[in-house]
UniProtKB/Swiss-Prot annotation:
Residues at which ATP binds: 10-18
EC number(s) given by UniProt: 2.7.4.3
Subunit relationships: Monomer.
Molecular-function GO term, any one: adenylate kinase activity
This protein's name: Adenylate kinase
The species this protein was found in: Methanococcus maripaludis (strain DSM 14266 / JCM 13030 / NBRC 101832 / S2 / LL)
Residue spans crossing the bilayer: none
Gene name tied to this protein: adkA
Locations listed in the record: Cytoplasm
Listed InterPro entries: Adenylate_kinase_AdkA (IPR023477), P-loop_NTPase (IPR027417)
Length: 192
């Protein structure tokens, strides 16, 4: 039997991973144990097992067809995990590149993953900008509030297209400054 597959997305700096991890910890205490999987890590595991990459940076240098195959295999592995327990997949709905927005979950991944719910974690663009500026542990491209808002709009559009292709519901969770507990509670209500 397939358990729930939930995809959690958000722009860099929105706090999606933090909100998800806190929700997972509380749900685990309640006896609901999700397996949390980062999609990029799942891809790296496949590439590493095949001897194609020994670090994540090397994956970007693989030819597009190999990358697509690795994406598909990672989606299949995550779907297999869902036979054992519910799975929360931490990934990006879209990736902003110099040539435009790249879908984080192209059709060949969605077919394998078949998510039940797609969650988009958001907040105001100026809050994200301030979080990015204060986070010295990460090297992120400097963006304007307007470009962050555009990226969030594209994430919503991509999430809805993922829903159209799979029948998944799409939920927007707001992670406002100082109100992370509200975001965690909202996320948990969907995950239960």
């Amino acid at each position: 039997m397939k358990n729930k597959v939930v995809v959690v997305t958000g722009v860099p700096g929105v706090g999606g991973t933090t909100v998800t991890q806190k929700a997972m910890d509380i749900l685990s205490e309640e006896g609901l144990n999700y397996k949390m999987v980062n999609f990029g890590s799942a891809m790296f595991d496949v590439a590493n097992e095949e001897g194609l990459a020994s670090d994540r940076d090397q994956m970007r240098r693989l030819d597009p067809e190999t990358q697509k195959r690795i994406q598909k295999m990672a989606g299949r592995k995550i779907a297999e995990m869902a036979k054992e327990s519910p799975v929360a997949v931490d990934t990006h709905s879209t990736v902003k590149t110099p040539k435009g927005y790249l879908p984080g979950l192209p059709a060949w991944v969605l077919t394998e993953l078949n998510p039940d719910i797609v969650i988009v974690v958001e907040t105001d663009g100026d809050e994200i900008l301030m979080r990015r500026l204060s986070d010295e542990s990460r090297k992120r491209d400097l963006e304007t509030t307007a470009s962050i808002e555009e990226h969030q709009f594209m994430n919503r559009a991509a999430a809805m297209s993922y829903g159209v292709l799979t029948g998944a519901t799409v939920k927007i969770v707001k992670n406002k400054n100082g109100l992370v507990d509200n975001a965690v509670e909202e996320l948990m209500s969907v995950l239960r």
